């Protein structure tokens, strides 16, 4: 977890903090990040709903359909996440999300996101750099996971030209949106970002999340 309040305090004492406190805060909050990516920037994502109670989660899961994935708005490394295959498992998913969440400023109850389980082919990470020279995307990085645990990465990954074009467009657009938010807060928005993407079995690419750092999957040499 990133202490965004400490980043903000440091930014008041020095010329610049990278990543900016505003960008780090957005990336740590799945609700703010998904609203920015999909609702403001128009990037493709899985169908989703947000919920602040068990009843809202039941309603959201019914809308996105089963199977679905439930995640705390604020968590990392898969903590609190679960795949829900029927309405009977919703209560357990809610409990899992509450136990796996980070400390949240709304009190004892943490909000969650419930999203459809996409027909995933593989995942990609696009390292994207924002600096005074502009925004640059690196060659996408392939990754392999086992039972939800990250195992290995390789760069460049093998994919079609169409997937490459989609991946680079989504990564650049997402980081441009984050930089705009940082600039609106008086920050420059520079940094290295790990943009995580889903590639579906039909070849389409969906936005997943952004880390305000290279991300574990981006640690290639």
Language-model regions, residue ranges each:
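Glycine-rich phosphate/pyrophosphate-binding beta-alpha loops
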Residues: 211-221
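Internal nucleotide-binding/catalytic subdomain
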Residues: 84-192, 199-201
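Conserved N-proximal alpha/beta basic substrate-recognition cap immediately N-terminal to
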Residues: 1-64, 76
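Alpha-helical transmembrane-bundle signature of multi-pass membrane transport and export proteins
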Residues: 45-46, 72, 129, 139
């Amino acid at each position: 977890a990133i202490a965004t309040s400490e980043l903000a305090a440091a930014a008041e004492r020095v010329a610049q903090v990278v990543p900016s406190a505003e960008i780090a805060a957005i990336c740590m909050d799945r609700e703010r990040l998904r609203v920015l990516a999909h609702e403001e920037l128009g990037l493709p994502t899985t169908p989703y709903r947000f919920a602040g109670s068990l009843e809202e989660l039941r309603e959201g899961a019914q809308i996105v359909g089963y199977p679905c994935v439930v995640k705390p708005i604020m968590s990392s490394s898969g903590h609190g996440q679960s795949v829900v295959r029927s309405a009977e498992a919703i209560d357990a998913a809610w409990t899992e999300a509450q136990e796996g969440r980070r400390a949240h400023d709304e009190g004892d109850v943490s909000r969650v996101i419930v999203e459809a389980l996409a027909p995933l082919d593989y995942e990609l990470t696009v390292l994207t750099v924002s600096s005074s020279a502009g925004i640059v995307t690196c060659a996408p990085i392939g990754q392999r996971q086992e039972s939800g645990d990250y195992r290995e990465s390789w760069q460049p990954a093998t994919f079609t030209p169409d997937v490459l074009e989609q991946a680079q467009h989504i990564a650049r657009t997402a980081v441009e949106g984050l930089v705009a938010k940082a600039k609106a807060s008086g920050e420059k928005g520079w940094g290295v970002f790990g943009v995580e993407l889903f590639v579906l079995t039909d070849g389409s690419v969906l936005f997943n999340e952004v880390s305000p750092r290279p991300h574990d999957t981006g640690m290639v040499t």
